[in-house]
Structures are given as C-alpha cells and as structure tokens.
Amino acid sequence: MAVITKIEVQKRSKERFNIYIDKGQGEEYGFSVDQVILMKHGLQKGLEIDEIELGNILYNEEVQKAYLQAISYLSYQMRTKQEIEDFLRKKEVGQAIISEVVSKLLHDRYINDKEYAVLYTRTQSNVNRKGPTVIKRELLNKGVQDLIIMHSLQEYPKEKQIENALFLIEKKKKSYQKHSFLQMKLKLDEMLVRKGYSREVIQICLEELKDERDDEKQQEALHYHGNKYYEKYKKYDGWTFENKMKQALYRKGFSIDEIEIFLQMKREEG
C-alpha cells in the first residue's frame, strides 16, 4: 500500500503531473500521469493506492500516451485504421493498448475508413489524375476493405476517367512528337496503364488521339529518325544498308510504305 504525498505540475507540460508516494519509508517519486488519468482515477494527496490500483493507473497512462501519439499523427492528415496501428507498432506499443486506442479513435470519429476512402479517391482523381486501378491498390495497401473501396470508386465515373486520361495524353504527347504515331501510342498506352486506367478507357482515349495526329507530324518523326539512322548506317552498301534502315525504322513504329518512301527520297538525293 502506498499513500500519495504530493502532486506537482511538470515544468515542461502543464497537462502532466508528477506523483510522489510514501510506501512507509518516506516520500519518493512514484510516477507521472496525464491530467486525464489524474482525473479519471481521482488522484489526490492522501489517497491510498494498492498494487492492483497502481497497475491500472500505469496501464491507463500508457493507453493515454499512445492515444495522444495517435492524435498527433492524425493532426497532419487523415489516416486509416491500419495506418494508425502500424504507426503505434513502430512506437513499440503493445497490441492490447493499440486495440484500446483504435477503439477510442473510432468512437471519437477521428478515424473512419469509409470517409477516408471517399476523400482519398476524390483527391487522387481530381488533383493527381490517377486511374481507379492505382487508387484501389493504394487503398488496399492502407488496409481499406474491398467493399469500402468499391463504394468510394463510385465517386469516380467513367466520364471523369476519360477526361483525366485525355488530359494526361495531351500533356505527355508533346514529348513524343519525334516518335512514330504507333510508337507514340504505345508509350501513351504504357503511361495510362501505369496511372491505373482500364483497357476500355485507354482505347477510347487513344482512338480520339488518332484523329488528331496529322501527316505532317508523322513525316517529321520519320525524317528525324530516318536521318539519324542514315548517318549511322551510311557506311554500309546496298542491301545491308537498306536492311538495317528498314529494321531500325520498323522498330520505331513506321510502316513499310513510309520507310520505302523515305529510302526512295534518300536514293534520289544521292
């Protein structure tokens, strides 16, 4: 049995208190608690506490400490239930305490995976223009359940996906102007897959792209790569030269007819 002899406010935090006790051998420092625990257990000078009660106080203090760590972590941005659990594990908090903290956070509505998933989907689609596949994968990695993700993705209709994909194409295609039309389409296709768009949405968007690509741009790309390979292979003669030129330009996505026209032009120049 111990008797509380003194309670003093900590110098660095007015919300924490040092508790001094006497176990029969004079006053000594016992433990420190948050003000929430002080009030919860009615700690005051002269109160007698046994070992069981002391154990309960110290356990609840650990819960409160972990709770405040979680609140601080949440102050920067919303988090999922799993993110909170992972954060506390890294802080070496025990599983029993983690369960209590998460339960309290859920009760206090500091964490809500349904709300998180909806807001995350809106942000990633509107700001970062990610496709639904990537958004789903990221939410799964954050521990959000499949059913909740399916509900949140209803906030991201196909029309919006197409709008975003077309925006990404328009932004990126400028860097592929020196590629053949086919190669440009392949690179844009790869980019949209990485961004998380479905095959259906990608095909719709690339079909629109086909109507925008003019012959002049295609010819510019052909001449750019053709002249580059011409300088590389002009040391070869006859069949070897033409074969290497055809293989190189074909790999770049140009048709046989386009390649033949370019080679004929080079013959006439020579």
Curated annotation (Swiss-Prot):
Keyword match Electron transport: no
Subcellular location as annotated: Cytoplasm
One Gene Ontology cellular component annotation held by this UniProt entry: cytoplasm
Cited InterPro entries: RecX_HTH_1st (IPR053926), RecX_HTH_2nd (IPR053924), RecX_HTH_3rd (IPR053925), Regulatory_RecX (IPR003783), WH-like_DNA-bd_sf (IPR036388)
Keyword Cytoplasm: yes
Keywords from the UniProt entry: Cytoplasm
Entry's Gene Ontology BP terms: regulation of DNA repair
Function: Modulates RecA activity.
Family: Belongs to the RecX family.
Alphabetized NCBIfam families for the sequence: PRK14135.1
Protein name: Regulatory protein RecX
The species this protein was found in: Bacillus cereus (strain G9842)
Gene this protein is translated from: recX
